[in-house]
Each structure stands twice: as structure tokens, then as C-alpha cells.
Amino acid sequence: MVQIEELGKAIAQLVFNRNAGNGPDKNPEIIGQSFRSLKTDTAFLLNHEPDDIELALNGEDGCGLERMELAAKLLIEESYLSSVPLPLLNKAQELLYYLQIHDTAFSLERMMLLQDIEVEIKRLS
């Protein structure tokens, strides 16, 4: 659980940096460290189905869904830095929908993120 808490703090730092205009300078390293901590990367997430991603992220503690939510948020933050953001946003959206269905708790925050992603996808399309 310590890993999940630390990754949550990293994501908060990513959002803070982006909102402060420092995202391009500081966020790539934080995103890379966070993916290494999750023992995954963008390529794996983009090329696998949510079920497979959950299994890979489960680890010894069975917290795959929690890690998947963090991975989805990392994809969103990475999309702000990418010259090709749509695949990242589409996968983040897919993972968040998967979480809404498979997690035991309904999340309003996830629903708001999904709405924001939808708006951004339409804007970029």
C-alpha cells in the first residue's frame, strides 16, 4: 500500500506541475519513475486488454485495480506531453470504464475524469 500512496502523491505532483506550467520540464521523469514503480510502461498498457493489465499489476497484494487506476491517470498526464495524445487518452478511458465496472466502489472522480477525457478526445479529433 505504501507504493500506491507514493504513486498517488506523484500523480498529484504531475497535476500541480502541469497547472503551474512546469509539466514539460519536470513531468517526463516523474512519469517514467512512476511507471517503473508500477513495473509497467506505456507500450504494455496500450497493447494489452484491461484483464491482462489487471493481472500484471496485481502483484503480491492483489491491488491490481488500484494500480490500474494510477496507470490510467499516468496515461492522462503523459497525453499532455505527447505529440500523439489520442491513443493514450483512449486507453485511459478504456481502463477507467473497466474500473467502474469491476471495482467494488463507484467513483464520482472516475466519472468526472471520463467526462474530461471525452471532451478532450472530441477536441483533438
Q: What role is predicted for each listed range?
A:
Residues L7, Q13-L14, A71-E78, A92:
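Structural register within alpha-helical repeat arrays
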Residues N17-K26, E77-L89:
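Short coil/turn connectors between adjacent alpha-helices in alpha-solenoid helical repeat scaffolds
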Residues D61-P85:
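Mid-chain, well-packed structural core segment of small domains
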Residues V84-S125:
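Amphipathic alpha-helical binding modules
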